[in-house]
Amino acid sequence: MAENDVDNELLDYEDDEVETAAGADGTEAPAKKDVKGSYVSIHSSGFRDFLLKPELLRAIVDCGFEHPSEVQHECIPQAILGMDVLCQAKSGMGKTAVFVLATLQQLEPVTGQVSVLVMCHTRELAFQISKEYERFSKYMPNVKVAVFFGGLSIKKDEEVLKKNCPHIVVGTPGRILALARNKSLNLKHIKHFILDECDKMLEQLDMRRDVQEIFRMTPHEKQVMMFSATLSKEIRPVCRKFMQDPMEIFVDDETKLTLHGLQQYYVKLKDNEKNRKLFDLLDVLEFNQVVIFVKSVQRCIALAQLLVEQNFPAIAIHRGMPQEERLSRYQQFKDFQRRILVATNLFGRGMDIERVNIAFNYDMPEDSDTYLHRVARAGRFGTKGLAITFVSDENDAKILNDVQDRFEVNISELPDEIDISSYIEQTR
């Protein structure tokens, strides 16, 4: 395992491994707007109403988007005018598209100048955001995008910046800071500064220091946008310090975990009964793709191996493997080459795999925030999904009660039979 490879970088800050950096999850923020239980709200107005560039509209049509979601409807009109934005919205509501479209709309590419900087807390999320930029800039051939994160050679990054300087840079704070300090990355022309899953970066003091140092290297006059699914009352003032009179949008209701179309159940069992129960459920449930969350790297490796031995097409992703391997496996799963993914919390936040319709908490998450991020992997984009949580001791039961109390949701015991139409889209 490439432990040193990972630990030498001030980057990965994964939830499941305390020794890299102390995990500090934010708490859900109070609502300013009630979404009335609709997960991806449909607005009659289309993207055309935002008066976007024709090249962007063509790419949006190619991606199959017809109507903006609630968060897009609220944010995009202000964001494309260059306003600072602080936005909290549930997972899967299309936050990424807000800043991708808003920055591409305003971008006037200048050769050799980086004008957009997007940072997030994990390499996988950085990789995914860079792919979104590529998707939406499909008809903007002059726009160059690059992604920089630790675990891969910094020399290659320096080479890219020197020979083929991007207009848009996506990355993790540790690597971005290293490139800025050694003068490879010039931040003097930044016009848009974006933090995705901002609470993750600003709650951890070492990462916050990196972000602050990078921020100070950018011009005073710029647009700042921050997004997250969880934004505690404590972290909001920290976010505001980076901004000038931001528009604040909270498209959420903290008291309800109404992930639209998501069925949630628990199973009481002993720890040594989990494998048998999991195999039985994978046999009887209909699924497109499944994500199974475990609490450690060792359990992740062992369970994936066991599933393969039982003829379940599983693949594992955890922070103990080299970066190239992780990205390659993520892409394999995304491309539907494997239907079952076993993962640590590394995969629990911000990852978009449209075909996932079942999420298992094989091991109970450590708190209600992590529960939200994990189960939101199923039933994203307003589709149906199923979340099943294994409860094996009193601590597990306590966390499940916390989830139910906090989100005012009733998670009932898994029945013997579940109506397939309740958790999978029926195609006729």
Swiss-Prot record:
GO terms for molecular function: ATP binding; ATP hydrolysis activity; ATP-dependent activity, acting on RNA; ATP-dependent protein binding; identical protein binding; mRNA binding; protein-containing complex binding; RNA helicase activity. The modification Phosphothreonine is found at T172. Residues 261-422 form the Helicase C-terminal domain. SUPFAM superfamilies: P-loop containing nucleoside triphosphate hydrolases. It holds the Pfam family DEAD. Highly expressed in liver. Residues 1-19 have a biased composition (Acidic residues). Signal peptide: none annotated. A motif (Q motif) lies at residues 45-73. It comes from the Eukaryota. InterPro entries: DEAD/DEAH_box_helicase_dom, Helicase_ATP-bd, Helicase_C-like, P-loop_NTPase, RNA_helicase_DEAD_Q_motif. Residues 76-249 form the Helicase ATP-binding domain. The modification N-acetylalanine is found at A2. The modification N6-acetyllysine is found at K36. It is found in: Nucleus; Nucleus speckle; Cytoplasm. It catalyses: ATP + H2O = ADP + phosphate + H(+). Involved in nuclear export of spliced and unspliced mRNA. Component of the TREX complex which is thought to couple mRNA transcription, processing and nuclear export, and specifically associates with spliced mRNA and not with unspliced pre-mRNA. The TREX complex is recruited to spliced mRNAs by a transcription-independent mechanism, binds to mRNA upstream of the exon-junction complex (EJC) and is recruited in a splicing- and cap-dependent manner to a region near the 5' end of the mRNA where it functions in mRNA export to the cytoplasm via the TAP/NXF1 pathway. Splice factor that is required for the first ATP-dependent step in spliceosome assembly and for the interaction of U2 snRNP with the branchpoint. Has both RNA-stimulated ATP binding/hydrolysis activity and ATP-dependent RNA unwinding activity. Even with the stimulation of RNA, the ATPase activity is weak. Can only hydrolyze ATP but not other NTPs. The RNA stimulation of ATPase activity does not have a strong preference for the sequence and length of the RNA. However, ssRNA stimulates the ATPase activity much more strongly than dsRNA. Homodimer, and heterodimer with DDX39A. DDX39B interacts with the THO subcomplex to form the THO-DDX39B complex which multimerizes into a 28-subunit tetrameric assembly. Component of the transcription/export (TREX) complex at least composed of ALYREF/THOC4, DDX39B, SARNP/CIP29, CHTOP and the THO subcomplex; in the complex interacts with THOC2. THOC1-THOC2-THOC3-DDX39B subcomplex is sufficient for the interaction with export factor NXF1-NXT1. TREX seems to have a dynamic structure involving ATP-dependent remodeling. This is Spliceosome RNA helicase Ddx39b. The gene is Ddx39b.
